[in-house]
Design a protein with these regions (language model features):
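Surface-exposed patches in mature extracellular/periplasmic domains of secreted proteins
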Residues: 58-69, 81-91, 141-148, 171-175, ...
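Catalytic Zn2+-binding segment of zinc metalloproteases
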Residues: 123, 133-150
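Membrane-active amphipathic alpha-helices enriched in small hydrophobic residues
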Residues: 153-168, 175-183
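Hydrophobic or amphipathic, alpha-helical segments that drive membrane association/targeting
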Residues: 2-102, 185, 227-230, 325, ...
């Protein structure tokens, strides 16, 4: 079977992890110990981090801070009510029209944009995330290793990742199973069906504790099953990786029947994110036509806000910033309070050539939405466009005190230093951005350029030299790991 680029990238990342000394040193799992002892949370996190480095480089990865912020707020609302609240999670989106979601080792959970658009309510989307969170908190990867009891850990990990981590696409699962060197695949798949039932049960409890409508889980899964029957061989990807049985649906229904009905309103951000994704789907003019048609339906004020937001995004994508500004003005008239409206307004002003107005909007928004990364990025870009590098540098320096691991902010800081003509600091900041993205060779190259910049002092050059030694050591360690594979 031919693997797509993302599949090949993830399998490569898995291979790097399995070739590492830590992986080899693990030895066989001790069946007398707990799942936590068989595969440590630290090892799971390391596997997940390695795979995420490859995912972030792939075009399918949706590098949209507003979508990521929404998913992480929603996911953290759920995970904070889990019995394993110490587990770290990161939620991200893949630009893929299929209906799928998947949990990877270490608490990384991916959601296809097609699934976000298919969810009719926020509780339905939360139900899917709760199910995936439960795969992580119940330590299904570690328990799968414990169940096997034979074969090398590397092979078991490959198979486990195929089942639990590589569910983003069926062909990736096949490829990872091939990397597992033909273990007893069917027995492990049967075991994973038990995990699906457990994830249903734990996820439902998590959904209820987080004050969502628990009927959202049954409604979404029933709709997926109906869709699968209608389209047979073209069933949603979620069904191929999360097989639904009548028994599972009946069990969900029985559990839900005993709970009182609770109507839970959707957040504004849920509707705005879906409108943004819809506006980015297909041809720009088709998106404009769809939102104009929906606006003509005279929806209630809450729904009108999402439609006008989506229409503004569609106009912007179609190269019509003046029309987009009219919709933003209508959102202001409706008194819609959201950081997504502020960033949209700033983007529209930038497209109309008014960088100063864009910067003013986001300066006003930053104190109100201090944790919104899209606001911080937008402010930096507006200040740079307005040729105000000193103001931008102050914003970047303050921001990196709170978010030192933000690769994008380091990259924006590098652009700021370039505008100021400070070459050493430009290359140093860009090196940090590359290092945080796992692009160590590019980071080393930037630091070498910083060494030759000719505009630094003794202290700055010493810092560059020290950081370059660290990066080179990491590169040497990785080369040794590949050699010992």
């Amino acid at each position: 079977m031919k693997l797509n680029p993302l599949s090949r990238a993830l399998i490569f990342a898995l291979g790097v992890v399995l070739a590492s000394p830590l992986s080899v040193a693990q030895g066989l799992p001790d069946l007398g110990e707990s799942a936590q002892a068989d595969l440590s949370p630290a090892m799971e996190r390391r596997i997940g981090e390695s795979i995420m480095l490859e995912i972030r480089r792939n075009p399918a990865y949706l590098d949209d801070p507003e979508v990521a912020s929404f998913l992480n707020r929603l996911g953290n609302r759920l995970s904070s009510r889990s019995s394993e609240s110490r587990q770290e999670f990161e939620f991200f989106a893949l630009r893929d029209p299929t209906l799928n979601a998947f949990a990877m080792p270490g608490g990384y959970i991916g959601v296809h944009t097609g699934l976000i658009l298919a969810a009719k309510t926020e509780s339905e989307l939360a139900a899917v995330l709760a199910h995936e969170i439960s795969h992580v908190t119940q330590r299904h990867l570690a328990r799968l290793l414990n169940k096997s009891g034979e074969g090398q850990v590397a092979n078991l990990l490959a198979l486990a990742v195929a089942i639990l981590a590589a569910r983003s696409s069926p062909d990736l699962a096949v490829g990872a199973m091939m990397a597992g060197q033909g273990l007893a695949v069917q027995n492990q798949l049967n075991y994973s069906r038990d995990f699906e039932r457990e994830a249903d049960r734990v996820g439902l409890e998590l959904l209820e504790r987080s004050d969502f409508d628990i009927r959202g889980m049954l409604a979404f899964f029933e709709r997926m099953q109906k869709f699968g029957r209608l389209y047979d061989n073209n069933a949603p990807g979620y069904l191929s990786t999360h097989p639904l049985t009548t028994e599972r649906l009946a069990d969900m229904g029985n559990r839900i029947q005993s709970r009182p009905y609770k109507q839970v309103p959707d957040s504004l951000e849920f509707h705005l994110v879906r409108a943004k994704l819809r506006a980015q789907t297909g041809a720009p003019r088709d998106a404009v036509a769809e939102f104009e048609s929906r606006l003509a339906e005279r929806s209630p004020a809450a729904a009108e806000a999402a439609v006008r937001y989506g229409l503004a995004q569609a106009y912007l994508r179609d190269g019509r910033p003046v029309a987009a500004q009219r919709e933003v003005d209508e959102l202001r008239r409706l008194k819609v309070v959201s950081p997504m409206v502020e960033t949209l307004d700033a983007q529209v002003r930038l497209k109309q050539g008014d960088a100063a107005a864009a910067a003013a909007i986001l300066r006003g928004a930053q104190p109100r939405f201090p944790q919104e990364r899209a606001v911080a990025y937008g402010l930096m870009e507006s200040l740079l466009e307005a040729r105000l590098p000193n103001d931008a540098l102050k914003v970047a320096e303050d921001d990196l005190l709170s978010y030192p691991s933000d690769a994008k902010m380091h990259s924006l800081q590098a652009k700021t230093y370039a505008m100021l003509g400070r070459r050493l600091q430009q290359h140093r900041a860009q090196a940090e951005a590359y290092a945080l993205l796992g692009q160590l060779a590019a980071a080393a190259e930037q630091l070498e350029l910083a060494q030759k910049s000719g505009d630094g002092n003794f202290y700055e050059y010493s810092q560059v030299d020290s950081r370059l030694r660290e990066i080179r050591k990491q590169l040497a360690d990785e080369a040794q790991q590949r050699k010992s594979k």
